[in-house]
């Protein structure tokens, strides 16, 4: 199966990010309308939000009016899989764009807004939001191998660099404090990225499936880390933090959170076939061991009382070594994962 299941899961995560900001329940209930190639929904103030585009244009100028109503918002899924788009112009009427709506536009090279746009600006075809100095969308069809995020940018939006396969190096300035969910997911040529000592939060799966990353260092400034941000990074061999990091620790390149003694990320590029989780660890995070193909055995101590979703996803060769009458034993049974006891004389394979 390889990583196909995790890519599918990641696409769901990206869509959930989009739905979260758009409030999916409301989207399902509200009525949508059509104007030419556009689908849109009415907002409470009488303006409209573009919810879909069905055209095949390569160079698209989004209208500022649809059926006589002002376009003020672009839904986060409006331009998904618009593979014909090469460039797009966003009108001054648009006031709201949250999660990258162009994440699946495989040929998109440039996003443009006017220099007088009240809410957004673009530099070299990359889209930013003025209010919070946030990078929203780096077009995935751009063929640059190196990109330097401008100084002064404070946030990288969820999915901002999603699946940008040409990039080998991204420089993040020390003005950035937030890296969103899936921000660099599937950037599989990315060999080097330095997280500055200004970042305080790293979102779910932020660097997942970056198959060329071999090492990464988390600075002392980082206070929050979501679901394994390095899941399924097949070449990643080590995660580093300083010995004095206030919130996180690493042992043999494996990342732990101090507050709840949780194992967050086991690098998928570690070549060892066996791993013993340290005694005293109480939790294994979501996707913590994702796509660790080389592992054949993980020993879980009786101190572990919580194991997250997909913690051992796509570990096809894995057998868990678990204590009798433990939480880990029940987890293995429930999830149909082969297991054995530490004495190795009582084998079960349910």
Q: What positions do the PLM features span?
A:
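Structural signature of tandem-repeat unit edges
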Residues: 37-46, 55-73, 82-96, 105-126, ...
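Bacterial N-terminal signal peptides
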Residues: 10-18
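Short N-terminal segments immediately surrounding and downstream of signal-peptide cleavage
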Residues: 27-39
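Sec-dependent signal peptide cleavage junction
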Residues: 18-30
